[in-house]
């Protein structure tokens, strides 16, 4: 993304993928813009400006996770989505909350490595070409004559041209490539991720520097050598420093299902452990330093977006200290028939476009009539009201059921055009959507 995207531009970008929920989009757009604003502020004050964390409240399937995911993609920032229910209080068996930052650091290193390798790709391609040409046309030994070098240069240029045009792709060559580190998958007990990671990194260093001779096609060798040469050109220490800085300044953590760790006063049971997870989250959200294998990472400027349906609990059931760490609260609306219709037609990768593309591969042209789309939206909305409100995810079930027979026999219908109108939808779905017992199990 352009770093100078205004909040309205961010919202219009999110509109391409998520229907409605303008309040939530507005809140995350402002949060993202504030990061850029903070970078423009002078140093003593800049350190004092911390992100305002967001709490999204709304039923499942209305776009909470998708908003956070698209925002991270837009910002090109390290992003991690985790369920709050996965964590246990320190001292209990299970994952502790510090692993959130460690996982985010891993994500940032991977992201930064990809970005750095893209920058040196042109140089890496040239070096890979030269290594393949050295195998195809070994360079002459220097015996004091200038003439053979010219001939070799001409032959080399000819082969280089053929290589670039793909004429040598199927030719088999033998060359030396780096031997990968021995693959060791170590399963550690819950809560011992640090120790497991240290053992894994210890074994990862064993195979470094070793070379293997392998036979492979030129096309396969070229890809392998590009990665190898790019890895040589990338400075690992700088890369790790950039990744750590990226996590500290731009990291986004999406805490899903936060309502499931809220203590409900009328219920007894495992409330101690729930409150313990909330207390463990507190320093992380407020700002602390976490030790990772890439160095110490401060969480002061990481943006936390929490979400929950809050069916059985309320935001006020969270411990007061944690409530205070999420000053921006946004309620997301349930989806209406009009929203469902827009989801099916207006988003960039709508379900209708996906099914059209899938069936096109079999030679079937799928056409969705306006009345067919409205009927689908009405059925999805009706089943959500009668059975269980699972939001936009209901459309997956409805669409699969609608196109089940067509998808199964698509290879026999090649060259045909199938129109999905209201009559087609009613023929296949009206009995199911009308019968509450059937829709409970099928739709």
From Swiss-Prot:
Key words of the record: ATP-binding, Chaperone, Cytoplasm, Nucleotide-binding, Stress response
SMART domains cross-referenced by the UniProt entry: AAA, ClpB_D2-small
Binding site for ATP: 19, 61-66, 256, 321, 393
Keyword Zinc-finger tagged: no
Single GO term (MF): ATP hydrolysis activity
Nucleotide-binding in keyword set: yes
Gene3D superfamilies xrefs: 1.10.8.60, DNA helicase RuvA subunit, C-terminal domain, P-loop containing nucleotide triphosphate hydrolases
InterPro entries named among the record's database cross-references: AAA+_ATPase, ATP-dep_Clp_protease_ClpX, ATPase_AAA_core, Clp_ATPase_C, HslU, P-loop_NTPase
GO biological process: protein unfolding; proteolysis involved in protein catabolic process
Domain of life: Bacteria
Recorded GO CC terms: HslUV protease complex
Record's subcellular location: Cytoplasm
Primary localization: cytoplasm
Function: ATPase subunit of a proteasome-like degradation complex; this subunit has chaperone activity. The binding of ATP and its subsequent hydrolysis by HslU are essential for unfolding of protein substrates subsequently hydrolyzed by HslV. HslU recognizes the N-terminal part of its protein substrates and unfolds these before they are guided to HslV for hydrolysis.
Oligomeric form and interacting partners: A double ring-shaped homohexamer of HslV is capped on each side by a ring-shaped HslU homohexamer. The assembly of the HslU/HslV complex is dependent on binding of ATP.
Database matches in NCBIfam families: hslU (TIGR00390), PRK05201.1 (NF003544)
Name of this protein: ATP-dependent protease ATPase subunit HslU
């Amino acid at each position: 993304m352009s770093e100078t995207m205004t909040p309205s531009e961010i919202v219009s970008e999110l509109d391409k993928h998520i229907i409605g929920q303008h309040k939530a989009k507005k809140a995350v757009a402002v949060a993202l813009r504030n990061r850029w604003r903070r970078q423009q502020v002078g140093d003593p004050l800049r350190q004092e400006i911390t992100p305002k964390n967001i709490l999204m409240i709304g039923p499942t399937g209305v776009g909470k996770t998708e908003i956070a995911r698209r925002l991270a993609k837009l910002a090109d920032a390290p992003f991690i989505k985790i369920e709050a229910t996965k964590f246990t209080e320190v001292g209990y068996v299970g994952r502790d909350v510090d692993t959130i930052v460690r996982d985010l650091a891993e994500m940032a290193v991977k992201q930064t490595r990809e970005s750095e390798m893209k920058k040196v790709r042109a140089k890496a391609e040239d070096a890979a070409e030269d290594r393949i040409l050295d195998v195809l046309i070994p360079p002459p030994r220097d015996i004091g004559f200038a003439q053979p070098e010219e001939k070799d240069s001409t032959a080399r240029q000819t082969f280089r041209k053929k290589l670039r045009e793909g004429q040598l792709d199927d030719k088999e060559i033998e060359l030396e490539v780096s031997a990968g580190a021995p693959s060791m998958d170590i399963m550690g007990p819950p809560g011992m991720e640090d120790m497991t990671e240290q053992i894994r990194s210890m074994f990862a260093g064993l195979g470094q520097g070793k070379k293997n001779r392998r036979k492979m096609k030129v096309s396969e060798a070229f890809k392998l050598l590009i990665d190898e040469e790019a890895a040589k050109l990338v400075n690992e220490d700088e890369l790790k420093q950039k990744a750590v800085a990226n996590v500290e300044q731009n990291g986004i953590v999406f805490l899903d299902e936060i309502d499931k760790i809220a203590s409900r006063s009328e219920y007894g049971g495992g409330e101690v452990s729930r409150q313990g997870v909330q207390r463990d989250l507190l320093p992380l959200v407020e700002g602390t330093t976490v030790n990772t294998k890439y160095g110490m990472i401060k969480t002061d400027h990481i943006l936390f977006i929490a979400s929950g349906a809050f069916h059985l609990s309320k935001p006020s059931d969270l411990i007061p200290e944690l409530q205070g760490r999420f000053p921006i609260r946004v309620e997301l609306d349930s989806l209406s028939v009009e929203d469902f219709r827009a989801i099916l037609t207006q988003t960039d990768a709508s379900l209708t476009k996906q099914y059209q593309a899938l069936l096109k591969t079999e030679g079937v042209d799928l056409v969705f009539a306006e009345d067919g789309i409205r009927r689908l939206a009405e059925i999805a909305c009706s089943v959500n009201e009668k059975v269980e409100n699972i939001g936009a995810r209901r459309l997956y079930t409805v669409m699969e059921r609608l196109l089940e027979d067509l998808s199964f026999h698509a290879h026999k219908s090649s060259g045909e055009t199938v129109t999905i109108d209201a009559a087609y939808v009613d023929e296949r779905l009206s009995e199911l959507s009308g019968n509450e017992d059937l829709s409970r199990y099928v739709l």
